[in-house]
Curated annotation (Swiss-Prot):
EC identifiers of the protein: 2.7.11.11
Species per Swiss-Prot/TrEMBL record: Arthrobotrys oligospora (strain ATCC 24927 / CBS 115.81 / DSM 1491)
Entry protein name: cAMP-dependent protein kinase catalytic subunit
Binding site for ATP: 214-222, 237
Keyword tags: ATP-binding, Kinase, Nucleotide-binding, Serine/threonine-protein kinase, Transferase
């Protein structure tokens, strides 16, 4: 095994051989997120090459201005992912997201989404034993990809129906870390089936000991905290009310809380509760120790076929679940996929998530991952998430997104509307077939938007060897386990930031409280 990578194939399918040394791979350039500023220093951005560094870490022969990386070394067939250099170090300065501008230079107007109605559809996750769409547990380090990491407890349980808190709840007494872990996530979800999740005003600052800052952004930061009651570690996202209002993020912030309050799934991050004071909003979430899939992908350059399949399968189950609840996610990308300490994925950042039963027109997302109907300002539905899954699979297999060309975001949009994708010869035939049916502008042919819905994706031949029930219950060993110690607040995978808590808990007039009545 290559010691500093440690990625194993979770499936029996052989890894397709890599291209010859003459084959070139492109390194994705940074692209802005539309419409929503990030609350994390690196979230919602494609990686930037530091102009002060003359070489890309994994390919010494390439300068930062180059659009290609020459001489990618081959992947070990069947089992291992190569290490092609040290982990790419992200720039620590804040990188605020930007919005699309029209030809006149003015930001596009956000059109309100349609009224919503409850969904009657059931996801495959639910049919395999997970909670129905009425379950009201939540998840997120929303908007803070570098800030979130796997839960310090497994599994994370919601508050029980009878009002008795489960062992992992922040307000309960200390428990043995190894106790209570024999239950599968499916069993946990079944137990939560009729639970009512109330998050408003559940905690106060006095319930937690603040440990350190995990990430910062344009209108907030995320802290690692320890519950004074059960001594477990959590992530508390703090948003400054004045900044949220100033940057016109009130609707997205409230949507994020609402979506996370409703969802409960093994591959979605959990929101335990919210509270506020005169100056700030607080969201108590799982602490996900393992970091972003983005970092692992950049370190490895690209994944073998079975490794990409494992992560894509977990994402597909999460999307299937969200869609059964009429929730469109709209911001799928490696930066928003976090690895828990066991190596399973957690989707975070629900700032763009929206409950939409039919179509919506809101322009939001990351340029590389936008579907053509979004770029063209047409009404769109849940199928945009399946398009994004195709882009994600392509990036995991190739190391770059299909419509990136090193130019401006507008050039990316032109490429998306043009719709021409060049598939490298080393992509597995089944994977290529799936991608061609996901990354298609024709909605009558896009998988996930057809008669059988998400099942047309899950039953595709590329996923043939996936046991979905075992995957949902986390019985399939992940290909990579992050080098962190669980249960002790190990934040070694996060950069250090100057601490700032002086504005927390101060009394005074609450000028913006009426915007956030549900916190």
């Amino acid at each position: 095994m290559l010691p500093d990578t440690g990625i194993l194939s979770p499936f029996t399918t052989a890894v397709n051989p890599d291209p010859p040394q003459s084959q070139t791979l492109r390194v994705p350039r940074p692209t802005p997120v539309l419409d929503r500023p990030t609350t994390d220093s690196t979230a919602n951005k494609r990686v930037k090459l530091d102009p002060t560094v003359s070489k890309v870490p994994w390919e010494p022969s390439v300068k930062p201005s180059s659009s290609k990386v020459e001489g990618a070394s081959g992947l070990e067939q069947d089992s291992f992912m190569p290490t092609l250099g040290s982990v790419f170090k992200k720039k620590k300065k804040d990188k605020e997201a930007t919005r699309l501008k029209d030809s006149s230079g003015n930001p596009d107007t956000i059109i309100e989404d349609s009224p919503v109605t409850p969904s009657t559809e059931r996801s495959l996750s639910q049919s395999l034993g997970s909670a129905p769409s009425t379950a009201t547990t939540a998840n997120s380090h929303g908007g803070l990809s570098t800030v979130t990491s796997a839960t310090s407890q497994t599994p994370t349980s919601p508050i029980a129906t009878g009002g008795q808190a489960e062992k992992d709840h922040p307000m309960t007494t200390p428990v043995n870390e190894s106790a209570g872990h024999s239950r599968s996530d499916s069993q946990t979800l079944q137990k939560a089936e009729n639970a009512v999740r109330a998050t408003k005003g559940k905690y106060t600052l006095q319930d937690f000991n603040f440990q350190r800052t995990l990430g910062t952004g344009s209108f907030g930061r995320v802290h690692l905290v320890q519950s004074k009651h059960n001594l477990r570690f959590y992530a508390v996202k703090v948003l400054k009310k004045a900044q949220v209002v100033k940057m016109k993020q009130v609707e997205h912030t409230n949507d994020e809380r609402r979506m996370l309050q409703r969802v409960k799934h093994p591959f979605l991050i959990t929101l335990w509760g919210t509270f506020q004071d005169a100056k700030n909003l607080y969201m108590v979430m799982d602490f996900i120790e393992g970091g972003e899939l983005f970092s692992l992908l950049r370190k490895s350059q690209r994944f073998p076929n079975p490794v990409a399949k494992f992560y894509a399968a977990e994402v597909a189950l999460a999307l299937d679940y969200l869609h059964s609840m009429n929730i469109i996610y709209r911001d799928l990308k490696p930066e928003n996929l976090l690895l828990d300490r066991h190596g399973h994925l957690k989707i975070t950042d629900f700032g763009f998530a929206k409950e939409v039963p039919d179509i919506t027109w809101t322009l939001c997302g990351t340029p590389d991952y936008l579907a053509p109907e979004v770029v063209a300002s047409k009404g769109y539905n849940k199928s945009v998430d399946w398009w994004s899954l195709g882009i994600l699979i392509f990036e995991m297999l190739c190391g770059y997104t299909p419509f990136w060309d090193g130019g401006s975001p507008m050039k990316i949009y032109e490429n998306i509307l043009r719709g021409r994708v060049k598939y490298p010869a080393y992509i597995h035939p089944d994977a290529m077939n799936l991608l061609q049916q996901l990354i298609t502008p024709d909605l009558t042919k896009r998988l996930g938007n057809l008669y059988h819905g998400s099942r047309s994706v899950l039953e595709h031949p590329w996923f043939a060897e996936v046991n979905w029930e075992r995957l949902l219950s986390k019985q399939i060993e992940p290909p990579y386990v992050p080098p962190v110690r669980g249960g002790i607040g190990d934040a070694s995978l996060f950069d250090k930031y100057p601490e700032e808590t002086e504005e927390y808990g101060k009394d005074g007039p609450d000028q913006y409280g009426h915007f956030f009545t549900d916190f």
